[in-house]
């Protein structure tokens, strides 16, 4: 795994000191260059929990990935730089409650205090978040903070204007290993109940908003100004993926 190539992939040019500023800059760089996407699932390409495969896909093939892929790669990058980082397990909040354990992966980075870091979520906080809950981050019209949730757990809370704080996902700070996510990785790719099998998704943060392709709809959020277009052909979808997400791949259908 070539760290220089990972840094080139995310367009990061700067110091590699072990501090909060560098961690934040690396996170921003990653989120604005590596899409959160599940295109392989809809192309019947199996996602295997293997760091070398994640590196090949994201760095060498200029693709994105979902939480296990992106957070695993970012974990390897931070570890090589010298950060005290660990993989942690989380559970996403869903319409009828909360998802099973290991349904989401995030990272915990220890500096002067512990920070939640996540580069593998469709829309989430862009900054390292201290689990003390002392910091509120704001991006894309949403505020975020970390707080205690139940016994020995924490949650990333979010709220929009004129709404109450609600948990986006729940996590513990216990160190986990990649292979522990195997069952849920398989579930996300195969279950009809999985959000990832229900719709094709590719989304990328930008400096002022977000680019999002969901099935046959492409949306550009530019500083709150929303523009949406319908995707009516395979060729149009592939053009959007290449021009906006820098992804070159064959799309078998667009239904």
Per-segment meaning from a language model:
Residues 229, 234-255:
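Generic C-terminus detector
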Residues 49-51, 98-101:
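Short secondary-structure transition/capping segments
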């Amino acid at each position: 795994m070539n760290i220089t190539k990972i840094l080139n992939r995310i367009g990061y040019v700067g110091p590699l000191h072990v501090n909060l500023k560098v961690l934040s800059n690396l996170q921003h760089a990653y989120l604005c260059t590596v899409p959160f996407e599940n295109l392989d699932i809809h192309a019947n390409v199996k996602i295997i929990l293997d760091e070398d495969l994640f590196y090949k896909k994201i760095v060498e093939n200029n693709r994105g990935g979902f939480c296990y892929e992106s957070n695993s790669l970012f974990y390897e990058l931070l570890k090589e730089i010298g950060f005290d980082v660990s993989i942690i397990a989380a559970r996403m909040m869903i319409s009828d409650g909360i998802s099973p354990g290991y349904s989401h992966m995030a990272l915990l980075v220890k500096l002067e205090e512990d920070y939640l870091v996540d580069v593998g979520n469709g829309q989430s906080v862009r900054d390292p978040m201290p689990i003390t809950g002392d910091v509120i981050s704001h991006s894309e019209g949403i505020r975020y903070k970390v707080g205690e949730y139940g016994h020995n757990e924490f949650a990333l809370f979010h709220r929009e204007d004129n709404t109450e704080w609600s948990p986006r996902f729940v996590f513990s700070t216990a160190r986990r290993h990649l292979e522990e996510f195997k069952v849920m990785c398989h579930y996300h790719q195969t279950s009809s109940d999985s959000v990832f099998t229900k719709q094709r998704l590719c989304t990328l943060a930008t400096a002022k908003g977000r680019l999002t392709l969901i099935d046959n709809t492409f949306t550009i959020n530019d500083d709150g100004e929303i523009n949406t277009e319908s995707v009516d052909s395979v060729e149009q979808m592939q053009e959007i993926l290449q021009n906006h997400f820098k992804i070159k791949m064959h799309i078998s259908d667009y239904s």
